[in-house]
């Protein structure tokens, strides 16, 4: 499955005003001294265009047969309505609480017959698109004031990774962590410590490890990890940065089972090829 076609983000000046408002709020509340006073939204799926702000990845990009889809699912009887424009070409919709994105498809281990250099398939994923620039420069997430990445998710019984891309000297580096849930098939709020992510490149853990560049986060995404043929489904309502440990209905407490390991720990499971290269 190729990348989702994206509509434009907010207009340049609208984005710049939003960023100016955020920076002003930090100064007024002295958050640069006292620390963040509340959570910071990273991405939510309350509008139809929210899924267009994401990119699909799978082994189909290298000739494999796995499929990947990202659908917007509103609550029953909800009708999207268009609000006033912000100067961009996209249609801005009124947010609908309770909406979510459904990432689903089928994993296939079949190798492409016309590309002998491809020796491994069986993966799929998606990530948020890189944020467009503002008058203040490149669009980046500064999550340094926060301890946790929080997410509202519902998974099947399969295994997934959470993947974080940052501005880096090595563009193909990813910071990864297992998405560990207690109740597959039910909605849960999961918290992962930013410091628990492990840096990888082309599916291998990088040694020595270096800390995530938390002031310059480019995108956040999810990927399958188990390489088992068959259907998969992961639903995501929203992602945000927080310092509030109590926000989680299920917190990532089983660190031994959830984290990647370095060369001094147990075996490491990672994603494959193309997901690192996009």
From Swiss-Prot:
SUPFAM superfamilies on file:
Galactose-binding domain-like (SSF49785)
Residue interval of the organelle targeting sequence: 1-8
- Protein known as: Complex I intermediate-associated protein 30, mitochondrial
Q: Which GO terms describe its cellular component?
A: mitochondrion; oxidoreductase complex
Which species is this UniProt entry from? Answer: Neurospora crassa (strain ATCC 24698 / 74-OR23-1A / CBS 708.71 / DSM 1257 / FGSC 987)
Q: Name one GO molecular function term.
A: unfolded protein binding
Describe its function. Chaperone protein involved in the assembly of the mitochondrial NADH:ubiquinone oxidoreductase complex (complex I).
Tell me the superkingdom of the source.
Eukaryota
**GO BP, sorted A to Z:** mitochondrial electron transport, NADH to ubiquinone; NADH dehydrogenase complex assembly; protein-containing complex assembly
Listed A to Z, the keywords are: Chaperone, Mitochondrion, Transit peptide
Subcellular localization: Mitochondrion
GN (gene name): cia30
Where does it primarily localize? mitochondrion
Family assignment?
Answer: Belongs to the CIA30 family.
